[in-house]
Amino acid sequence: MEQIPAGELERAMKVQDVMVQAVAKKITWWQAAEILGISERSMRRWKFGYEKHGLRGLFDKRKGKASWKRAPAAELEKILSLYRDQYFDFNVRHFHEKLVEKHDIHWSYTWVKNVLQSAGFIRKSRKRQPHRKRRPRRPLPGMLLHIDGSHHQWFCDGRWYDLLVILDDATSEIYYAQLVEDESTRTVMRALRHVIEQRGLFCALYSDRAGHFFFTPKTGGPVDHRQRTQVGRAMKELGIEMIPAYSPQARGRGERNFQTWQGRLPQELRLAGIRDVENANAFLTETYIDEFNMQFAVAAAQTGTAFAPTTRQDLDRVFSVQHERMVRQDNTVCWANGTLQIQPQSWRSTLAGCRVIIYQHLDRTLRIGYGTHQLGRFTEDGTVLAESQPQRTVGGKKKSAQRRWGLISSKTVTSAAR
């Protein structure tokens, strides 16, 4: 005799008890259907099966039979083998996409996830956190950009790097993604300058309260908007508002974005055979950022853009680390346990006692500035670099210095000459 599951047998016996009462006319058939929670049509079908086959007629005939939708055993083994041998470190969503793209396997995501869970390859997801309301996106690209870094083993070999990412709040489009040794003032400035040169000036920047973004006098407390970091000073010069985030939940859009990066980029780098930062950054720039945006970017709520094209010629100066120094009597300034010698200037006999600015550029060269004048250019270790001779213009020496320093464009000087 065919083995009947205990649960199925118990269910059939309960149905039988109700049907016996209906057969004995203690209750009507529609009352029996109401007790069992089924329709009158199903009740008639069960009554016919019971009269013809007895208790066995009440069993679900699908029980114990393989579903016609069931995957062939060979295909099931192929999926498990692919995950075990080739995609062992992929998350389920990423693995499912590869099955469709690379192997022409079109089972549903949920089915693939259940197969991997049943085989013990992945664990069931943790219980979700309490519901939080999502902040609406900004309607236009360029209104708000997120910047953050993710410290992770991107090569899965014990080496830790920061992935520095800038994304648009309106579309989740990635404008910049590069691996760096650490998230710092210099790497953040390089990223922001890249976006401004490629896209234009944006309205606001949303970030955590790391020391290169904000001064926070008390740990966990509010930021001090009166004191500005080097990044804060650069953003103020460009008219970009900086908005601090006070919790990981407040940075939810960026945090979710990094979960996606951590679940995909290490595996993509492994498949591409990339093991170093230089090639990884080239891969990101030339290939992966575009693929990522095609899959995860969304359309903005409104047409248009909030980016404003910039004609500024002084981005080298803006995106530099600036230090104020007092010129000593011998026309030198202190720098990094050494001195920088200011060369004689035709427009002033001595600069002793003047306050000057040392500009530490992203390429690690140094410049000394006094107002609109450049007083010298140096390597990182203080070696003097030769400067090109200034071109004479009708605008005079001051405008020539301004153009060299990037405070006005060459077009402005040309129009003045005319």
What are these regions (language model features)?
Residues 287-418:
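C-terminal, beta-rich DNA-binding module of retroviral/retroelements integrases
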Residues 54-147, 152-153, 217, 222, ...:
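Basic, flexible linker segments flanking DNA-binding modules
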Residues 1-42, 47-62, 86:
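Residue-centric detector for conserved, function-critical "anchor" positions
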Residues 18, 32, 43-46, 54, ...:
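Mobile genetic element proteins and their domesticated derivatives, centered on retroelements
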Residues 167, 180-181, 346, 381:
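A generic structural motif
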Residues 196-224, 245-248:
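Acidic/histidine-rich, metal-coordinating catalytic segments
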Residues 74, 85, 105-106, 117-174, ...:
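Mobile-element integrase/transposase regions
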Residues 224, 230-302, 306-317:
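Charged alpha-helix within mobile-element recombinases
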